[in-house]
Every structure is written in C-alpha cells, then in structure tokens.
C-alpha cells in the first residue's frame, strides 16, 4: 500500500452555523471560521471537514442544497470561501467539502424545472411514480410526496423538501461530476460524502442502501473527478461491515479513501428500535468487540476506516457515554486517548476538544432540529408523554451537537454579538476555549498531544492491533510493529477497576492520571486512561 497524507491526518469537523459568527446576525459564517484558523492550527489538525455551506433554504440545516456552486448568503460569499481555502492552505490545513448528492432541495433549479415541465430532461433527474409503495422516510412518514401539478409522487428519503436524485440518469451523473470538478479546481482537499450508500437505491424493490449499482457509480465518479488527485474522500455508510468497507476503500477498487461506519454508534440505541429508544448504559463488552472487529478485519492493505465519537448528528460523547458531571474532563480525555491511537483517521467534532456537553432541553420551543420536531409531533399524536419525548431529545437529539461553539465566558460564549440561532449551553462560563487554553491540564491539550503522537509515530498507520483480556469495564489494547509496542488503557466507568498487564513501561506518552510504572496488579481509578510505550 502506498501511504497517503490522509493515513496520518487528523480531521476537525466544523458545523458552520454554530462555529463563529463574524457579523452579529446570530449565525456562524465563513469569515468566522477563517478568524479561528490559528486556533485550529494550534490544535494541530490536518484538515477541516466543512458541513454544507452551499445555497440552501435550510430546511435541514444546509443538507438541502438549492445551488451546489453558490454559497448561502447567511455564510458569506464565494470570495469568503476562496479566502478560507487560501488562509487554511497557508497553515497547511486542507478544506474537505460536504458532498450531498443523494438528494437536492426542492428549490434547486433542476427540481423546479422537473415540476414545471414533465417533458424536461430534469424530470428524470428525480424519481417519480404514479403510485407510492410503503417505503418510509428517515425523517418520519412516507418517503413519497404527491405533486398535484403532474399527478405523480416523488421520492424523498429525508424531508419532503429533499427530493432524491435518480442516479440511473447518466446526464445527471455528469452534471454532478462537473460540479465536483468545480470545487476541486478551487483547491479543496477532498469530499465527505453524505449518505453515499443510498445513491444505488432501487425503490420499486425497496432496496435503499448498498444497491447493485452503488460501487460502479462510485468508480465512475472517482475516474471522472478526484481519482488522479491527492484528495481525501470519505463516505457516510451507516450499514457497512468491514467486508463492505473494503469495496469502498480498497485502493485497488478505485472508489474512496475511507468510510464512516457507525456500528459502534449503534450501541446508543436499543436493538431493533428507532433511535429515540436509547440505551441507558454503554455495553462496553460489545464496544470492545466492534472495535476489535474493525481494527483487525479492515487491514491497511485493503481499506481504511475513520475514527470518531461525535458529529453534527450525534449527542456529545461525554454526555451519552461519559460522565459530564463529576468526571467530565477525565471521561472526555479517556474517550480521546482510547480512540486516537487506533488504526484509522481520527475526526474531532467542534467543541469535543474542550469537552462540550449535551444541552439541558426542557421544552419543545427550545428545539430547532427537524428530525427531533418530527419525532415529537408523531410521538405526541400516539399519546407518548411530553416528559418522555423531552428525555429522548435531551439524550439523543441532534441539536446537542449544534449549540454554538463556546469560545469564552463573555455573552453568548463569544460566538456572536447578536441573538444566536440556537441557544448557547448555559455551562459556557465554565466550559470554553479561553479557559481550556489557559489550563495546561485541559482536555484541549490532551487532544493536541494525541495529534502530535500520531504525527511523530507514523508506524501506527500499519501497526497491528491486539485487544487485551481485561475487566469488563476496562478497554485495553496494544499497537505493535516490529519492536515497537504501545499499550493503551481506559477505564470506562465511574468505579475503580483492577488491571493486570504483562510488560514493563519504557515511557509514558499520554495520561489523564498518574500512569503507573508497574503494570501488574494495579487499580485504575474511575475514568483512568493512558498510553505507554512498552520495553
């Protein structure tokens, strides 16, 4: 395998609406991001994954795109975008664009024309049927919406304002590749591909994910756009197994650099239930089993994985699986140390590096997220008590990740001089960037050190992974390459745990505790975590 820059990269996800507001309108924007590049350079990241900034009516916070080659006015202008790319490049940071090509907005010119004129070429860019089948939208209700003008139904697996594209149409595919090349020519560093495993769907056969044409489409895309360029491409693939991940990310297959797989995230939900039926407690044995499978079965020669706990759709890791009260700092560091030394490309979501937490939502009028609001409406109709609904939204709702970035202890956490589009977490006076940078023992410096360890130990790209047999609540593994061995240990609980590991410590690389020189028969305090090099 030829080693690429992204094997050793660490990517930072920016959710633009909530990162930094430069003009006081309460919404984060591109100049705001540019103004914080020095902070991100200090963290040490290699690339920024930018959630969508394209022109959009914002029905789903920008994942409903009206024009792929224009910037939404709330985020700024194309000049602002060009400046962000250029300023990031000066700091050796690449910009990864979010590519949403499973669907568009219903306000995209293609869909407007498709509705106006049933004989237009654009009509076939979307999926129309005379009668709907029983496919459901991921955002609740039917996946089919009736269009009165033409008397047909169009398919939308997300909101009805997000009609699905018909990838069987070759002309549409060429239009998408032209748009991708427009961004590549601007100097971006790659693409994160939203729900890309859905583009091969066959709705009449109820095939939604991993349809038979998915991989041929991706190979065609690769060859028409980024294939001969040194770009990072990552596909959002909810249903992927290690075997499926190889189809996407084996360099010989000429598709993508890596995948986002979500098997570990599935442990947040009760099996066979909608996401709102969340698991009260993390099944650590299952977590170890899942990571062990991905670390050992997706080898460096035949594929590549992403490493993440958080993104814009998920609750804060320190709140759902950590302890965001008594052990907030320690549990946040434990999850970071555990993840960042595995094989794969780590992703940090904005605010994760300072230990931002879920928001204490109390009423529905505090909620902005379309998915949460649709769930609440349907649940209320079914007679589910509002207390139960709010509990689910507090724990698992997407707005938890979307509250504004907490920069300092000034009004609105320094995010905006205006009224923020979504309320700032009331804990911002204690949890903010200014506080983190001033404290040498903060979560921020743990992340900074982890980024540095990866840069200085490129052998970790290829190193073997060995899961160790430990107490149930302890996750421990060894990364090994030739004579070099790193031992990583994390106690994922609020209780003390016993640990016995054979071997002698050569040096301590990182810790959130006082790492013991002697590994045999030690007692781990709650949320203890460390990485040591073994002799």
UniProtKB/Swiss-Prot annotation:
NCBIfam families: PRK10933.1
Keywords from the named record: Cytoplasm, Glycosidase, Hydrolase
Cellular component per GO, a single term: cytoplasm
Reactions accelerated catalytically: Hydrolysis of (1->6)-alpha-D-glucosidic linkages in (1->6)-alpha-D-glucans and derived oligosaccharides
Physiological role: The physiological substrates may be short isomaltosaccharides.
UniProt-listed Enzyme Commission number(s): 3.2.1.70
Subcellular location: Cytoplasm
Family assignment from sequence similarity: Belongs to the glycosyl hydrolase 13 family.
Residues of the active site: 194, 236
Top EC category: hydrolase
UniProt-listed Pfam families: Alpha-amylase (PF00128), Malt_amylase_C (PF16657)
Protein name as catalogued: Glucan 1,6-alpha-glucosidase
SMART domains xrefs: Aamy
GO MF assignments: alpha-amylase activity; glucan 1,6-alpha-glucosidase activity
One annotated GO biological process: oligosaccharide catabolic process
